[in-house]
């Protein structure tokens, strides 16, 4: 695992820039060799962040499909998985977790370099902003890693048992992840490159893909894209 106090070229999904206040956040990358499908890494990491927020700050957070963690409607954390294979053909994954821990949300604005990025300030938050007090990054990291390790080892054990991914560990993670999704049941838009698809987020399948019911009644499977919630 690698931790840093600052990133000069942090990245989110689809090449987006991850911006944070130096010395205030959790910026971590964990090298793993999962024996299970990578989408389960996204699920377990998202749940680890949600659980750690609840334990550390007594704040209820939710997951925005596929891998953002929200408090209310504002993003407080993001997950990024990058995968490859070693020379023996074994899966290698880097699990990146970024959490806005300390600092007031207003502090983020000076680190945004364009009008588009500056507009994102209205959709971000920090744990300190919501909790009202500075949060120990060390305590948060320890709790988060404990949750990641527990779920990761359970999935590794399940994968080597020869009974596939329908056993309790993966099923429990899927069910808990689905239960924390704030996206389901909402009318949303999904931006995919230059195109946009709108409809109601009806469910997710076992692979974590989003099932979107379009206004025509057609149900389409969404494997990637940026989900946008309409203004309330």
What are these model-derived regions, one by one?
Residues 1-9, 13:
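Flexible, acidic active-site loops/lids enriched in D/E/S/T/G that coordinate Mg2+ and/or position polar
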Residues 4, 61-65:
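General beta-strand structural signal in soluble alpha/beta enzymes
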Residues 12-14, 105-106:
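Short glycine-/acidic-enriched loop or helix-start segments at secondary-structure transitions
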Residues 13-37, 41-45:
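DPxDG-like acidic metal-binding loop motif
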Residues 36-37, 43-61, 71-232:
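Long, positively charged amphipathic alpha-helical accessory segments at protein N-termini or as interdomain linkers
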Residues 68:
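Conserved active-site carboxylates
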């Amino acid at each position: 695992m690698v931790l840093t106090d600052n990133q000069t070229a942090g990245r989110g999904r689809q090449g987006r820039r991850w911006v944070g206040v130096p010395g205030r956040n959790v910026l971590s990358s964990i090298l793993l060799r999962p024996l299970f499908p990578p989408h389960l890494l996204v699920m377990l990491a998202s749940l680890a962040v949600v659980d750690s927020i609840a334990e550390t700050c007594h704040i209820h957070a939710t997951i925005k499909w596929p891998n953002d963690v929200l408090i209310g409607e504002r993003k407080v954390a993001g997950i990024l998985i990058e995968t490859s294979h070693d020379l023996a053909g074994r899966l290698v994954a880097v699990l990146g977790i970024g959490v806005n821990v300390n600092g007031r949300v207003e502090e983020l604005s000076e680190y945004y370099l364009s009008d588009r990025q500056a507009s994102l300030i209205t959709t971000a938050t920090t744990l300190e902003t919501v909790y009202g007090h500075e949060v120990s990054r060390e305590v948060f990291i320890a709790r988060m890693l404990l949750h990641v390790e527990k779920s990761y080892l359970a999935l590794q054990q399940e994968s080597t048992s020869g009974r596939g991914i329908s056993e309790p560990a993966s099923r429990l993670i899927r069910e808990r992840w689905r239960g924390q999704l704030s996206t389901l049941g909402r009318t949303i838009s999904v931006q995919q490159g230059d195109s946009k698809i709108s409809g109601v987020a009806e469910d997710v399948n076992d692979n974590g893909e989003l099932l979107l019911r379009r206004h025509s009644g057609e149900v389409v499977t969404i494997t990637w894209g940026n989900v946008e919630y309409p203004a309330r």
